[in-house]
């Protein structure tokens, strides 16, 4: 179960109690979710960093920092992490992503997120299949680099 606008430990525990044996993914996309992240991640099975809504809740320059911080904390606590929203947003209208978007996806891979997620790109975009193919290509190249990097050291 993905809990939109997860904002407190109590909210997540209440949902867990009512949905026995379901995994809970807490979507961090509000100021309260940011403020209570540590307590939310403790009782969640994983976290989705929902960058679109998050960028409307906090100033845009904080989103990349929060993504890195939340990813690191979740992985240290052995929780899974999904980076979501606006990963390849320009592909809703264009057949190719921007360089910044490609770097954004690669950096999520380098940070060891468990998944990256497309939204508008595949839901309402003009190039849904191309978006998936491009996302996969970026992930494959990024993972290759991580393997090569191990051999360099």
Predicted features and spans:
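Non-catalytic helical/linker scaffolds that mediate oligomerization, partner binding
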Residues: 1-153
């Amino acid at each position: 179960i993905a809990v939109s606008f997860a904002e407190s430990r109590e909210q997540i525990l209440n949902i867990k109690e009512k949905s026995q044996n379901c995994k809970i993914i807490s979507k961090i996309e509000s100021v309260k979710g940011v403020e209570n992240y540590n307590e939310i991640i403790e009782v969640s099975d994983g976290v989705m960093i929902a960058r679109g809504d998050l960028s409307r809740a906090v100033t845009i320059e904080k989103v990349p920092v929060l993504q890195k911080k939340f990813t690191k904390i979740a992985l240290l606590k052995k929780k899974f992490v999904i980076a979501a929203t606006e990963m390849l947003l320009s592909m809703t209208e264009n057949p190719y992503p921007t360089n910044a978007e490609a770097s954004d996806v690669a950096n999520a891979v380098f940070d060891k997120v468990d998944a990256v997620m497309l939204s508008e790109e595949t839901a309402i975009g003009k190039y849904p299949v191309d978006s998936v193919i491009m996302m996969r290509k970026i992930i494959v190249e990024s993972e290759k680099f991580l393997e090569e990097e191990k051999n360099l050291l």
